[in-house]
Amino acid sequence: MDNILLGPSISKHDKPKKLMVMLHGYGDNAANFIHLAEPLDQDEWGMHYVALNAPSIMPGNPMGYQWFDLYLNGVYISDVGPKEFENVRNLINENVKKISNTISLLTNDLNIEMSDCFVMGFSQGGMMAFEL
């Protein structure tokens, strides 16, 4: 289970035609973010929505998650040295693999083609979606 991510899903369809993977922002969580699916949904899309929790709990916010830490030893990410930045880059790459593994599992379970899978994200989740 360490190589996939979990989170809530919403679907109005027994056999959805498309998959929307939703990646929340820094300090948020999948349970909050999944509610954006309801106003987005159009019946004709046949969409299954799933929001994934980032793998790390945010320091100082036990209900919030992060895709990567913005503060390394109290220093903002844009001000860290090359070694620390490389560590963050490696973590981002690991988390992209987890997202990809999860998408593969979901498309297989739902019998949805990868070309019918969409990824959206907000803030840090948008950065992760871009990395895919």
Question: Where do the PLM segments sit?
Answer:
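Active-site signature of alpha/beta-hydrolase-fold catalytic machinery across serine-
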Residues: 35, 131-132
